[in-house]
Amino acid sequence: MMVDPLYKGGLTKPLCSSGLRPITDSCVVIPNFDNSVRSIIVVNILVFAGILYSQFRNTLSIFSLWCPNTRAVFLFICPCLLYFYQGIFSTDEQIGTFNIIWMLRRLTIELIIRNLNAEKER
């Protein structure tokens, strides 16, 4: 049972079992996101973890075969992936879940700027 101060039928009402249904007098709606949204959130978090890892470790052996400036390439690709994945899967009902991803984007852009400034100073 969950307390709902706006509910006029009593102090508490049960939670809805599943789905994004309209709020009725019988239950409280809990958003039930499908697997695509969960997987996109996980992908974004993993990408951001990779960005942090690349900031603290100088070795990225996969990318070093392709380009000498590996960290700049890696930090350019990751935000593009963030925008690509969220652009496909975001809807009006799910936009609240992506607040964490917006924060990760800001941090990603900050890391890119710091990385590029550090490389200019070298």
UniProtKB/Swiss-Prot annotation:
GO cellular component: membrane
Top-level lineage group: Eukaryota
Transmembrane parts of this sequence: 36-56, 72-92
Localization in the cell: Membrane
Induction of the gene: Silenced by SIR3.
Swiss-Prot/TrEMBL keywords: Membrane, Transmembrane, Transmembrane helix
Chief place where the protein resides: membrane
Topological type in the membrane: Multi-pass membrane protein
Other facts noted in the record for this chain: Partially overlaps YFR055W.
Protein name: Putative uncharacterized protein YFR056C
Organism from which the protein derives: Saccharomyces cerevisiae (strain ATCC 204508 / S288c) (Baker's yeast)
